[in-house]
């Protein structure tokens, strides 16, 4: 997360005002999933392990069993975990990282274009997954051009 100077107003995440002194506190509260995962990994297993190796997440235990539970919710085959990254579609990669974000148990999940590479059935599973995360107390902020997906969200802001 970089800074774009504000011309007016403030940004708060939870009760924390965003500024240079609080950025690390806020980063600990957010799971971020970009539209395109430009990570230099050969194996999905390595891609999944990265967030758990980061300093801010080292206290979060990794569980293959929990990962597979989330895979099931998102319509992903378990064997994806042992494949090469280049054998996995963009939509599958994004859903894999959604599963990882849920495992990190952050209060805020930010995701860019979560349905851009998905069919209608997978889109429905992702939307249902977001709803379950919200029921568990997480907020999900998604940027999307998919009007069908957006119509299933609790709040919609059009820009």
Language model region names:
Residues 1:
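Helix-to-loop junction immediately C-terminal to a conserved catalytic motif
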Residues 6-18, 26:
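Conserved ABC transporter NBD signature motif
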Residues 42-57:
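Q-loop/switch helix immediately C-terminal to the Walker
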Residues 61-80:
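Conserved ABC ATPase "signature" region
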Residues 84-88, 92:
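Conserved ABC ATPase signature
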Residues 98-99:
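Hydrophobic anchor residue at the start of the ABC signature
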Residues 109-113:
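Catalytic Walker B motif of ABC-type/P-loop ATPase nucleotide-binding domains
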């Amino acid at each position: 997360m970089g800074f774009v100077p504000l011309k007016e107003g403030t940004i708060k995440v939870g009760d924390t005002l965003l500024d240079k002194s609080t950025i690390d506190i806020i980063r600990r509260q957010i799971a971020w999933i970009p539209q395109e995962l430009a990570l230099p990994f050969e194996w999905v297993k390595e891609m999944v392990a990265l967030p758990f190796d980061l300093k801010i997440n080292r206290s979060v235990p990794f569980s293959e069993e929990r990962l597979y539970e989330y895979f099931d919710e998102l319509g992903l085959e378990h064997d994806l975990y042992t494949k090469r990254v280049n054998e996995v579609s963009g939509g599958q990669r994004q859903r894999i990282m959604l599963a990882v974000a849920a495992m990190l148990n952050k209060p805020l999940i930010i995701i860019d274009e979560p349905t851009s590479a998905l069919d209608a059935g997978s889109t429905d599973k992702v939307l249902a997954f977001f709803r379950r995360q919200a029921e568990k107390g997480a907020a999900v902020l998604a940027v999307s051009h998919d009007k069908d997906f957006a119509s299933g969200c609790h709040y919609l802001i059009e820009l």
